[in-house]
């Protein structure tokens, strides 16, 4: 049976992650309060950010920027701004 969490991003009960995907205290917080769906949404935004801003994960400043964007997206309800990107109409 799938584990459920109250997802802070979706603001509803949803299927939780199978295991902690991110290290440290932030990873524990994500595991306990973020759903699979919200994590998947973040991964799409993360890919766009890395590509559009040409982030290098070997650069500590770039990793810090990406982590802050992740916290903003998952816990603070702030969408990721990618210059020039217009989301498709639903």
From Swiss-Prot:
SUPFAM superfamilies according to UniProt: YggX-like
Database matches in InterPro entries: Fe_traffick_prot_YggX, Fe_traffick_prot_YggX_sf
Name this polypeptide is given: Probable Fe(2+)-trafficking protein
Function summary: Could be a mediator in iron transactions between iron acquisition and iron-requiring processes, such as synthesis and/or repair of Fe-S clusters in biosynthetic enzymes.
Keyword Iron: yes
Species this protein is from: Actinobacillus succinogenes (strain ATCC 55618 / DSM 22257 / CCUG 43843 / 130Z)
Keywords from the UniProt entry: Iron
One Gene Ontology term, aspect cellular component: cytosol
A biological-process GO annotation: cellular response to oxidative stress
Family, similarity comment: Belongs to the Fe(2+)-trafficking protein family.
Keyword presence, Protein transport: no
